[in-house]
Amino acid sequence: MAKIIGISGGSGSGKTTVVSKISEFIPEFVLISQDNYYKSVGDYEYEFSKVNFDHPDAFDNNLFYEHLKNLKKNSPIDMPLYDFINHKRQLKTVMVVPTPVIIVEGIMIFVEERVRNLIDLKIYIDTPNDIRFIRRLKRDISKRGRTLESVIDQYLNTTRWGYYRFIEPTKEYADLIIPEGGHNDKALYVLSTFLKSLSKEGLDFV
């Protein structure tokens, strides 16, 4: 069975940076982003402005779980792709062929017990709120077609609440907590040393 490394934390915490660091020591892996499993806005019965993207129900949790389960069993999947500008799932999918290591990242991957049980190594990125907000603001404006006002509105109305209600509490499930995200050189050194030793020993996490 494939081994799954899960990386979670609030939006803008530095998950992508940590994935990049891991890639230096485990060069062959498949990356699954929970973001691709957002539901299309058209799936909701109410208008877009009322959609809460910072709630577990915003994701297609059943599909996400089934895909991780299949990958763990070394079965390929057709991963969805999410269009953040139009807020809907694209018509095309990407076939993902599993490798010995699967890295899955997302803000709420530790929320559901059934998903947690599939993850062999859980890493939580703990970054201060102000830094995360600034990173999210820059990303959403430059890459997701958002306005300054809409990002601030979303943060104050749903993102901040969702973080404290659903995301931060999942720290208790983490095997490793990395403060300051991808800029904590000491923590990343410890992680890289650990992963390097696992790689030499055949990646037996448990």
UniProtKB/Swiss-Prot annotation:
Classification of source organism: Bacteria, Pseudomonadati, Spirochaetota, Spirochaetia, Spirochaetales
Keyword flag ATP-binding: yes
Principal EC category: transferase
Compartments reported by the entry: Cytoplasm
Main location: cytoplasm
Catalytic activity, reaction form: uridine + ATP = UMP + ADP + H(+); cytidine + ATP = CMP + ADP + H(+)
A GO MF term: cytidine kinase activity
GO cellular component, one term: cytoplasm
Pfam family, one: PRK
GO biological process: CTP salvage; UMP salvage
Annotated keywords: ATP-binding, Cytoplasm, Kinase, Nucleotide-binding, Transferase
Name of the protein this chain belongs to: Uridine kinase
InterPro entries: P-loop_NTPase, PRK/URK, Uridine_kinase, Uridine_kinase-like
UniProt record similarity statement: Belongs to the uridine kinase family.
Enzyme Commission code: 2.7.1.48
Biochemical pathway: Pyrimidine metabolism; CTP biosynthesis via salvage pathway; CTP from cytidine: step 1/3; Pyrimidine metabolism; UMP biosynthesis via salvage pathway; UMP from uridine: step 1/1
Residues noted as binding ATP in the record, renumbered to the chain: G9, G10, S11, G12, S13, G14, K15, T16
